[in-house]
């Protein structure tokens, strides 16, 4: 059974529910997007004996320009394939298939980087920053699923200010998504945001 943990912050993201809320989805079948991801993860792992996200994270840590912040256990970055202007991922530095494998210290580090990233989001436009987020991890089907590397993705809709939202329309609906700013520029803007929430210094 694939389990997905998803959450939304503020109603502008994707719902009419005006408060932050979370959901846990469990299904008998794997959704198409996740199935495609699993196929590619499995193929890479079989060929390289390493998780795709482990290899990807090594490259990002060398380049550094898309890194937002990091701590001992996790890295927050803007992936080079990001669709949303300030899309981000939190990836564990150690290859864990599931959030259930984290140690007590790693859980604290996960909470810490989650707090840092969401404060930076709020500070970007000095507003409670809307986003949808979700954790992808190995299915609970009793298989090894060694190819999976748990990660959390954030899809925020804001573009240039607290009132300008990105819409997927026209060519983006019928062709492919277009980026309004580069992942490198988005990461730089978020990296330069304070880790102290704007509301506490006003």
Predicted features and spans:
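Contiguous mid-protein beta-loop-alpha structural module that forms a pocket-lining wall or clamp
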Residues: 8-9, 17-26, 33-35
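C-terminal helix-cap and adjacent tail motif
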Residues: 28-68, 156-202
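Long, well-ordered alpha-helical scaffolding segments within enzyme catalytic domains
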Residues: 50, 102-128
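Short histidine-centered catalytic/ligand-binding loop motif
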Residues: 90-111, 175
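C-terminal hydrophobic structural anchor segments
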Residues: 123-166
């Amino acid at each position: 059974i694939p389990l997905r943990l998803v959450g939304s912050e503020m109603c502008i993201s994707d719902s009419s529910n005006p408060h932050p809320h979370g959901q846990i989805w469990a299904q008998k079948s794997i959704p198409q997007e996740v199935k495609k991801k699993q196929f590619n993860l499995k193929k890479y792992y079989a060929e390289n004996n390493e998780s795709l996200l482990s290899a990807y994270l090594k490259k990002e840590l060398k380049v550094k320009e898309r890194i937002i912040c990091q701590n001992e256990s996790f890295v927050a970055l803007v992936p080079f394939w990001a669709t949303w202007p300030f899309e981000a991922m939190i990836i564990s530095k150690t290859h864990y298939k599931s959030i259930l494998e984290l140690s007590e210290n790693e859980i604290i580090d996960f909470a810490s980087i989650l707090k840092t990233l969401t404060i930076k989001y709020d500070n970007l436009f000095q507003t409670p920053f809307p986003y949808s987020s979700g954790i992808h991890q190995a299915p609970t089907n009793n298989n090894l699923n060694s190819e999976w590397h748990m990660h959390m993705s954030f899809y925020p809709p804001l573009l240039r200010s607290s009132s300008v939202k990105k819409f997927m329309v026209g060519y983006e609906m019928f062709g492919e998504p277009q980026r309004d700013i580069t992942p490198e520029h988005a990461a730089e803007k978020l990296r330069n945001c304070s880790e102290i929430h704007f509301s506490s210094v006003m």
